[in-house]
Amino acid sequence: MTTIGTPLRTNATKVMMLGSGELGKEVVIELQPLGVEVIAVDRYDNAPAQQVAHRAYTISMLDGNALRDLVEKEKPDFIVPEVEAIATATLVELEQEGYNVIPTAKATQLTMNREGIRRLAAEELGLKTSPYRFVDNFEQFQQAIQEIGIPCVVKPIMSSSGHGQSVIKSEADIQQAWDYSQQGGRAGGGRVIVEGFIKFDYEITQLTVRHIHGIVFSSHRHIQVDGDYRESWQPQQMSDIALKKAQETAEKITSALGGRGIFGVELFVCGDEIIFNEVSPRPHDTGIVTMASQELSQFALHARAILGLPIPEIYRISPAASKAIVVEGKSDNVRFGGVDKVLAEIGTNIRLFGKGEVNGHRRLGVILARDENTVRALETSRRAYDKLDIQL
């Protein structure tokens, strides 16, 4: 039997979010109606999840001592990493001391860099992946490109949302791709992965929820530009064979990582074949579409799994689509005009994340749309997006 205390009382059930972005914000919003006290932590003040949590702290989560001090001060029942840039060695120690890390400290440590998870998937589990090489310097980088061939994809081993990622289409791109990879990693310059370019039919995210009574799945299709999510929709028509292989692949990788919670497993679909790309042990940015398409969004599913609550089934309520609001420029005073026009479109909703500034390009919100099918839902989301007036 699961027992939940009362927030802001001595018997409170406490969740500490490590990372307080827009995905963490929605998890906080789902945890609070379940009676959970939430502490939101990030590297900068007033991050999205901090705006809705009971308490907020600003620290460098790569500082193991600062992270330990905060955990020992708050004594959370559950520690929930939402980003990669965390002192994972400290999480391993805390877990060994009895703290509950979601899904596990091992999962957080392995997935914080692409090398750990790629070697687990390809070399230990035997999952199909693109050909790859890991390199530490420009000389190795050139050799890897020669072995893999052009076109190929370059990514820092520690980055997200496309930062530092590029596609080499000709030899003229090599130097620029290396330089960009050294600027875009979460931990600065360093080791990168060079991957063979996969000719796929489409990409899906296989949301995989490990909960107290087993595993449930929910898949959706997405489009990325330079490694960053732009659109997603659900449902995505795919063959029964491909769907079964996608679920088997997702179950293998998430079972190896262990624990409870939601995982976003990125897969390439080539006919009936499935090729593993990446996995995140947390809600996935492309999964925001589930806020419109499912009775229980990915955030609600994660909240239930964290607390050890049952998930009998995932019920889909409507075809739906999401379109990311990506802003380019420089400003600390972003405003959104035309929100009334966006919401005048039947079946639409908008989520503005509350991020305080933009310097370059940054995802600041998302438009959601429901319709009778995914084609119409995508059209509605794009039409609504065009009515938004972003002011820097």
Swiss-Prot record:
Cellular component GO terms held in the UniProt record: cytosol; plasma membrane
Entry membrane topology: Peripheral membrane protein
Biological processes per GO annotation: 'de novo' IMP biosynthetic process
Residues annotated as domain ATP-grasp: 119-307
Amino-acid positions noted as binding ATP in the UniProt annotation, renumbered to this chain: 114, 155, 160-165, 195-198, 203
Annotated residues for binding of N(1)-(5-phospho-beta-D-ribosyl)glycinamide: 22-23, 82, 285, 355, 362-363
UniProtKB keywords: ATP-binding, Cell inner membrane, Cell membrane, Ligase, Magnesium, Membrane, Metal-binding, Nucleotide-binding, Purine biosynthesis
Top EC class of this enzyme: ligase
Pathway note: Purine metabolism; IMP biosynthesis via de novo pathway; N(2)-formyl-N(1)-(5-phospho-D-ribosyl)glycinamide from N(1)-(5-phospho-D-ribosyl)glycinamide (formate route): step 1/1
This protein's name: Formate-dependent phosphoribosylglycinamide formyltransferase
Organism: Mannheimia haemolytica (Pasteurella haemolytica)
